[in-house]
Structures are given as C-alpha cells and as structure tokens.
Amino acid sequence: MATSSSAWLMFSDHYPEILIAIACFLIFSLLLSARSSSKDSLPYNWPIFGMLPAIISNNQFNDFTTARLRKMGWTFIFKGPWLLDMDYIFTCDPSNINHMFNDNFENYPKGELGKVFDIFGNNIFNADGDLWHDHRKMAQTILWDGNYRTMQATFIRNKMDNALIPILDSAACKRKPVDLQDVLLRFTFDTSCFSVLAADPESLTMEFPPVPFSKAADQALDAALTRHITPRLIWKLKRFFNVGSERTLAVAWKVIDSYIYDKIAELKAKRKLVGKINSYDAVSFYMDNFNIHDDKFLRDNAFTYLLAQRNTQSLTMTWLFYALFENPKVELKILSELKSIVDESSERKFNDGFALFDSNMIQSAIYLHATLCEALRIYPPVPFEIKDAHKADVLPSGHKVRAGEKILFSPYAMARMKGIWGDDCLEFKPERWITGNGTLKHEPAYKFFAFSAGPRICLGKELSFTQMKMVVATIIYNFHLQMVKGHVVEQSNSILMDMKHGLMVQVRKRSVM
C-alpha cells in the first residue's frame, strides 16, 4: 500500500500536467453530460455541483429555462452547489407571480437582492417599506406631470427630425447598412438624458461617437448578472480584492458617477447663474417641487430613470422590428393604419418630405399599440427577475418557500406556455390584443408582466407606450427596413434581452404620401 502511495506521489510530482489533463477531462465530461441531456428534462443534480453545470454549459439561458418550465408544469426547484445557498425556485406560473406581487407583496421585498444592484443606490428600484412609498409618490408626481410629458414629447419629435430621420435617410441614400439596435439605444439615451438631466449628449449623430456612459452601464448590468449566478461570499471576496467582474464594475461605476454628477453640477450652476428656470426634467423637479438638492439622492434617482428609459424602450423597439421582418403582413397593417391617421389628421407635420408623428396623432393607432404589446409579450426587455422571500411561504403552485429562498420567475417563459397564452402562443399575433369591438384588450399584469405588477407596477407605462409609438410610427411610415441577409440574431445572456450581434438593416425610403 505504501509503495503504491509513494508511486502516486512521485507520479504527481513529475507529471502534474497529466493530473491537470485528467481533471480537465472530468470537468469537460461533466459539462458535456449536462449539455447532452434532454432539453426538456430537469437538469441533473450532481453531487457537490448541483444543477449548475447545466446552466454553465448552456449559452441560451432563457430558452433553457423555458423548456424545463414547460416540462415541469411551470415551476421547478433548481439545486445549486452544496453549501453555497444557491438553490432557486424557477417559475412562470401566473398564480405564483400574482401571489408574490399582489396577494403577499410584503413578504417579497427587494431585501438582500438590493445589495446585488447596489450601483443603483438608495432609490425607488432598491427601496422597501416607507422609503419606497416616498420614492414612488415623488416619481408619480414627476412622470404624470403634464409639463414633463409635453417637454419629453417635444424633444423626442425634435430628435427624430434632427437626428433619427437624417441618419436613416443617409443610410438609404448610401445603401449602407446600419445597426438598428445601436441607433435606437443612442436615440433613447439622448432622450432619457434630456428628460432626466436637461442635457442632450448628442450620441445619435452621423459620426456615431463612443458613449462611455452607455458602455459602463452595460458593464454594470453584466456584473450584476454575474453576482446572481455567483455565491454571495465569492463575489464579495472578488469585490474586496478588486478582481474580475467586480473590478470591471468598480471602473464602470466611476464612469457612471462622473457623468451623472457632472451633469447635476452643470444644471445647478446654470440655475445659480440665471435663477430658477422653467425646466421640467426629473432632477429639476426634485429640486423645485420637493426641495431635494442632495447630490447623492439626485444621482441615484437619475441613474434609475436613465436606465429605465434607455434600455427598455430601445430593446422593445428593436425586437419589434425584428418581429416585423419575420411577419411582413403585420407591417403592412401598421402602415395602412398610419396612412389613415395621416390622411385624417389636421396636424400633419412634414419636414423635407418626411412625416413626423406626435403624441396626439398616434393615440388612435390601435393596431400599432397592439403590436408593441405583442413585442413586449414575446420579447420582454427584462426576461427574468428574482425575488427573496422574507418569511417562509407556500406558493399557489404548492411549492414551499423557505425564508430567504430565492425565486426566479420568467416572463419570457410565460409567453411561450400554451396553457397561459393559448395554442398560438409562439405566433407573433397583435390581433390577440384587440377585442371584437376594435378596442385594446386588457390582460392582468401578472400575466403580461412587461411593466411589472402589483404595487410596484411601472408608473411610466402609458408614457412609454406613447413615446415608442411616436418613434416606430415615424420609422415605418417613412422607411422600409430589411434585415441584412445572413445576419444572425441571437439573444445575449444578460439581465436585459439585447441582441448579441445587434440588428443590421438595410434602409429604403418609402413613397406613401
């Protein structure tokens, strides 16, 4: 026995690379086994590793989760590695979502998950209890203010006139493909900066300049996703030693803070120089209406508003156009509706032969609104969310929840369940949102979760619809877009459902006036 032990030690001393190769082979075999298992079966629960190898080996998390939820009746238990507190309940059951966001709302606060998104600071996104109520009341006052909405609508129209249309027109004239996702991200970044900070960064220009803030924000969200799938102790150690994704987050955080604090300082300096100005941006609103001048408070809320507007709107519109490429009959119906609106409108606005749709003109665009709803259903900009249980609970599905246990729910998967949306759930079908009387059909928020549900439902829902309809209508009426042949559309593995390779399109001017 001693001889064989000595031989093993000698072997390991002289041939460490062979041991490394053996270890790599075993790990590779584990991942291969996880990857080759039936796509509809529950992930194999390995000793020590749990079900994590199945996640690591899969590059399409949303589709992976959807297949398992479909097989397991909309809810299953995900077992993480031993001793690392990474067990989850995965669900797309509307009754469970209604329970967490409505019936037992107080038991599912932001809690510990707020620490994962600490870059947002102490604001409406991370707050709980009375502090959250206070933030929400202030946000409601801002977002529902008539002057704020008018200012935004005017700026969006001007941005379409002076930036969006010229760029698409140039692409059409030069027959040069453009990345529509990038165009829309820049557009919504400019509009959100103006509505929040009274500043136009002019990121959407012919030169397509670098946008350090946007890059940093994307890196910060990626780091947050890494925290979600990493044991808490590990990512906190990485943060302490400033390595890996935590180092990337720290650098991105500085870029974000520098940009927002600079804009707040500029706005305050302008106000000090000329006195109170009639500006209805969010930061000015906090200072004028609530007498809040603390830079940290303003920074935290500004960052939340910026990301909420920039990311969700741009990604929704990007996926909508992709859906139109796959369903050209839907685009023709939208175009027909827009022609009728333009013909009947007394507020027809043209510039250099291009039609501009304002907030009043698109109110009657029922089919366009339904198409946006369908895009949000099938391609939710936030494909999954995570909740922590404050106390032990039992979900309507019958699954027991331990205090502190995490629940991942998937609006993306919900949209793909026949038992929830019908046998045609995989079809892009705006008609499902229109009643027999031609009005918009309402679906409960816990089923159509694009704007959250319950007390935390998005306050800017209708404002967001109005703004997106203005942009989409203006693009569709004036231009015909086609996806570049051979372009691959693939979801990123991210907290947000952006396109990994963008959306490359060819642009052609329409002749519809």
Swiss-Prot record:
Key words, A-Z: Alkaloid metabolism, Heme, Iron, Membrane, Metal-binding, Monooxygenase, Oxidoreductase, Transmembrane, Transmembrane helix
Membrane topology: Single-pass membrane protein
Pathway named in the protein's UniProt entry: Alkaloid biosynthesis
Classification via InterPro entries: Cyt_P450 (IPR001128), Cyt_P450_CS (IPR017972), Cyt_P450_E_grp-I (IPR002401), Cyt_P450_sf (IPR036396)
Membrane-spanning residues: 14-34
Residues binding heme, per UniProt: C458
UniProt name for this protein: Noroxomaritidine synthase 2
Organism field: Narcissus pseudonarcissus (Daffodil)
Lineage: Eukaryota, Viridiplantae, Streptophyta, Embryophyta, Tracheophyta
Gene (name only): Cyp96T2
